């Protein structure tokens, strides 16, 4: 008796079981990087809460920008395209089927013969008339076993690339929110400084006239006029800068909101208090939230999956196909003449080793490159966060130092006004102290703006809060 299974059939059965046992493998974790366990700067006392820092008008502007911005829309389209590629790659896991049908109408082979007399010679002539019809149909199915996870790793690479495209959306949204907040707060600071700058110009002009009169009376040297004139020119230039900067910030908002120029003119308000000092989580947890770090990590996952695909290309492939076809000139022929087929196809790479070696080395080089990119991204991200915290601390110290100057200027202006009212000092002297107070008030607004801009930059560097 012949054995039921030949050695080749046993080998094919074993390969089938092996192929069914493997599924899509998730990209493994890369080598852990040495990250600090704590931040260099002293921790804050407030839980990061970006939404709690926004007034309703700013929150509404951010929502409009997120809905209308073109950069976010383009990133979303790229992510959608990447998802479609993942779905196409996943189809390789499913059997592929095909159906075909055909119909023909050749000239009828039935013929008639008659004799024709040509020059006394009888020649038989055959003629064919009429048409015949025949029909056929076939159906087939094929399936490739993923013996070495080649298809699974190819899908994993596509999935990692799609997730990397998704991080672009998060990065764009984060950037837009930060830019809208910065433009809004800058516009608010400019609007708050404008009445102070106008009042300072009025005071300086009056001081200039009083000084000119005292110079004519011989009470002051002419050089004092030049000093006041320089102060007036600086005050007028500052007011012009405020107007120009306000227009530029409106243009920025127009671009972010996808609106026509000159852009919106909101009644912006700069927060009266300094921003809170945030208490950050562990560096590893914070870095994991950044879109650029996520993209770099996904790049490593995709490169690792591609390397595994290149390794699997070196091993045999096994696929199966089955088909059923039939046809004929009549309906009875369809049932009487079916043809079924089954085939197993084993492809073994034997003479293409040089190309496969180069392909594997290219994939390994790509993996090394993405690993270095991940390390570089982590180091730069860590330095960026620490730098933003240092800048925020510097802005806070500058604001505190100016608070002392503002208190001194306020007290000096109060005393000068009292002395002027009792005739102890001239009006020009009192106006100068009042101008110094306006300088300190404008500096306080600028330093408070700097603090909030640093807070926005810190929010962006943290990957959202």
Identify the function of each model-found stretch.
Residues 56, 76, 93-171, 277-285, ...:
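Small/polar-residue-enriched beta-strand and adjacent coil segments characteristic
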């Amino acid at each position: 008796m012949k054995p039921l299974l030949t050695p080749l059939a046993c080998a094919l059965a074993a390969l089938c079981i092996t192929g069914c046992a493997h599924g899509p493998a998730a990209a493994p974790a890369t080598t852990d990087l040495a990250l600090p366990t704590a931040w260099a700067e002293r921790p804050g006392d407030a839980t990061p809460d970006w939404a709690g820092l926004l007034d309703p008008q700013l929150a509404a502007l951010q929502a409009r920008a997120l809905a209308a911005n073109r950069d976010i829309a383009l990133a979303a389209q790229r992510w959608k395209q990447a998802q479609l590629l993942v779905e196409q790659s996943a189809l390789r896991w499913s059997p592929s089927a095909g159906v075909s049908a055909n119909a023909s109408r050749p000239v009828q082979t039935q013929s008639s013969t008659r004799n024709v007399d040509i020059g006394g010679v009888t020649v038989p002539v055959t003629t064919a008339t009429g048409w015949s019809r025949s029909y056929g149909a076939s159906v087939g199915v094929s399936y490739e076993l993923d013996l070495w996870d080649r298809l699974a790793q190819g899908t994993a690479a596509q999935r990692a690339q799609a997730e990397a495209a998704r991080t672009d959306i998060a990065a764009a949204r984060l950037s837009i929110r930060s830019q809208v907040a910065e433009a809004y707060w800058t516009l608010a600071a400019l609007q708050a400084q404008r009445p102070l700058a106008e009042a300072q110009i009025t005071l300086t002009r009056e001081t200039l006239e009083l000084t000119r009169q005292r110079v004519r009376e011989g009470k002051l040297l002419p050089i004092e006029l030049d000093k006041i004139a320089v102060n007036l020119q600086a005050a007028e230039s500052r007011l012009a800068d405020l107007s120009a900067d306000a227009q530029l910030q409106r243009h920025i908002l127009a671009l972010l909101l996808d609106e026509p120029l000159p852009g919106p003119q909101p009644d912006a308000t700069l927060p009266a208090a300094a921003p809170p000092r945030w208490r950050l989580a562990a560096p590893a947890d914070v870095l994991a939230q950044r879109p650029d770090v996520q993209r770099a990590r996904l790049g490593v996952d995709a490169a690792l999956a591609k390397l595994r695909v290149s390794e699997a290309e070196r091993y045999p492939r096994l696929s199966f196909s089955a088909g059923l076809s039939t046809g004929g000139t009549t309906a009875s022929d369809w049932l009487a003449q079916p043809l079924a087929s089954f085939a197993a196809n084993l492809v073994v790479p034997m003479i293409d080793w040089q190309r496969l070696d180069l392909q594997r080395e290219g994939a390994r080089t790509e993996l090394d490159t993405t690993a270095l990119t991940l390390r570089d991204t982590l180091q730069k991200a860590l330095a960026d966060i620490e730098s933003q915290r240092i800048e925020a601390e510097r802005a806070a110290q500058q604001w505190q130092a100016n608070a002392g100057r503002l208190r001194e200027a306020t007290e000096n202006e109060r005393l000068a006004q009292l002395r002027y009212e009792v005739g102890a000092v001239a009006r020009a002297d009192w106006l100068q102290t009042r101008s110094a107070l306006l300088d300190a008030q404008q500096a306080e607004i600028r330093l408070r703006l700097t603090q909030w801009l640093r807070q926005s930059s810190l929010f962006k560097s943290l990957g959202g809060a």
